[in-house]
Swiss-Prot record:
Protein name (Swiss-Prot/TrEMBL): Phosphoribosyl-AMP cyclohydrolase
Subunit structure: Homodimer.
Subcellular location: Cytoplasm
HAMAP family: HisI
GO terms of biological process kind: L-histidine biosynthetic process
Protein species of origin: Zymomonas mobilis subsp. mobilis (strain ATCC 31821 / ZM4 / CP4)
SUPFAM superfamilies in the cross-refs: HisI-like
One Gene Ontology cellular component annotation held by this UniProt entry: cytoplasm
Residues annotated as binding Mg(2+): 82, 84, 86
EC number from the UniProt entry: 3.5.4.19
GO MF entries: magnesium ion binding; phosphoribosyl-AMP cyclohydrolase activity; zinc ion binding
Pathway entry: Amino-acid biosynthesis; L-histidine biosynthesis; L-histidine from 5-phospho-alpha-D-ribose 1-diphosphate: step 3/9
Cofactor note: Binds 1 Mg(2+) ion per subunit. Binds 1 zinc ion per subunit.
């Protein structure tokens, strides 16, 4: 049986018990997976209004706009939501590296045989 949450046109994010939703960011031009973060209602609304990715920092317990210190903002081109409305997909144009380490993507290491292997920058 179809329901509005899965099939309807009403935006109704399924916030978790902490009031958060997972956001996956990819490069709008290349499709590269850049990072995963979390949004609360306020950061989601700010992201939609400003077209710049803004999140809830679970460690610092505050709103943060990606790149507010480094200048490496993420310009939102498109926001999608999954069928359960519990995960967001932001297609962005990155204004610099996505990772705080300076890597283009936060996913710059492979897990092999229980160890981490750094992927060369030209292979990320």
């Amino acid at each position: 049986m179809q329901n509005d949450q899965d099939y309807g046109n009403k935006l109704n994010p399924a916030w978790d018990e902490k009031g958060l939703i997972t956001a996956v960011l990819t490069d709008a031009k290349t499709g590269l997976l850049l990072m995963v973060a979390h949004m609360n209602k306020e950061s989601f609304e700010l992201s939609m209004a400003t077209k710049e990715a803004t999140f809830w920092s679970r460690s610092r317990k505050k709103i943060w706009r990606k790149g507010e210190e480094s200048g490496h903002v993420m310009k939102i081109q498109e926001i999608r939501i999954d069928c359960d409305q519990d995960t967001l997909w932001l297609k962005v144009i990155p204004m610099g590296p996505a990772c705080h380490t300076g890597a283009q993507s936060c996913f710059y290491r492979l897990v092999e045989d229980g160890h981490l292997v750094t992927i060369p920058k030209d292979k990320i």
